[in-house]
UniProtKB/Swiss-Prot annotation:
<dbReference type="GO" id="GO:0006457">
    <property type="term" value="P:protein folding"/>
</dbReference>
<keyword id="KW-0813">Transport</keyword>
<comment type="subunit">
    <text>Homotetramer, a dimer of dimers. One homotetramer interacts with 1 SecA dimer.</text>
</comment>
<dbReference type="InterPro" id="IPR035958">
    <property type="entry name" value="SecB-like_sf"/>
</dbReference>
<comment type="function">
    <text>One of the proteins required for the normal export of preproteins out of the cell cytoplasm. It is a molecular chaperone that binds to a subset of precursor proteins, maintaining them in a translocation-competent state. It also specifically binds to its receptor SecA.</text>
</comment>
<dbReference type="GO" id="GO:0051082">
    <property type="term" value="F:unfolded protein binding"/>
</dbReference>
<keyword id="KW-0143">Chaperone</keyword>
<protein>
    <recommendedName>
        <fullName>Protein-export protein SecB</fullName>
    </recommendedName>
</protein>
<dbReference type="GO" id="GO:0015031">
    <property type="term" value="P:protein transport"/>
</dbReference>
<keyword id="KW-0653">Protein transport</keyword>
<dbReference type="InterPro" id="IPR003708">
    <property type="entry name" value="SecB"/>
</dbReference>
<keyword id="KW-0811">Translocation</keyword>
<dbReference type="Pfam" id="PF02556">
    <property type="entry name" value="SecB"/>
</dbReference>
<dbReference type="GO" id="GO:0051262">
    <property type="term" value="P:protein tetramerization"/>
</dbReference>
<keyword id="KW-0963">Cytoplasm</keyword>
<comment type="similarity">
    <text>Belongs to the SecB family.</text>
</comment>
<dbReference type="GO" id="GO:0005737">
    <property type="term" value="C:cytoplasm"/>
</dbReference>
Length: 156
């Protein structure tokens, strides 16, 4: 519903729409193949890091990037490594200004994550390893951690 001047009404419901999602950057490395494909003598060490960035694009649109870096190694020897930047363009409307950042950095990556997880699982499987199923991520906790780090940086 709109007012007579064409603007949204005060009671318009908040909305979050996915306009596009895409692989922005992706790499998978299997540097020690075919030796790395043999049954490992022990459980590999798996390391995964997740970062989220959001940039406003105007008209309520935001580009949100979910960056997942990781890999597996045994005794310091790399089995595989990957880097994925999976992004989406979202339209966020009728959300209070103070809530835009949490929506962009919590809810948007939550929608992107299952697709990014599948891309990584498929790449690891296609690299000759069992699929890597990344555990669900608590994006609210990541956001809180980020806010604490930024607060500490400002105080320093």
């Amino acid at each position: 519903m709109a007012t007579q001047n064409g603007g949204p009404t005060q009671n318009a419901a908040p909305s979050l729409n996915v306009l596009a999602q895409y692989i922005k950057d992706f790499s998978f490395e299997n540097p020690n193949a075919p030796r790395s494909l043999a049954a490992p003598p022990s459980q590999p060490d798996v390391n995964i890091q997740i970062h989220v960035n959001a940039r406003p694009g105007g008209n309520g649109e935001f580009e949100v990037e979910l960056k997942i870096d990781g890999g597996a190694s045994i005794e310091g020897n790399t089995l595989f490594a990957f880097e994925l930047v999976y992004a989406g363009v979202f339209r966020i409307l009728n959300v209070p200004e103070e809530s835009l950042q949490p929506v962009a950095l919590i809810e948007c990556p939550r929608l992107l994550f299952p697709f990014a997880r599948q891309i990584i699982a498929d790449a690891v499987r296609n690299g000759g390893f069992p699929p890597l199923m990344i555990d669900p991520v608590d994006f609210a906790a990541l956001f809180q951690q980020r806010m604490q780090q930024e607060g500490q940086r400002i105080q320093a």
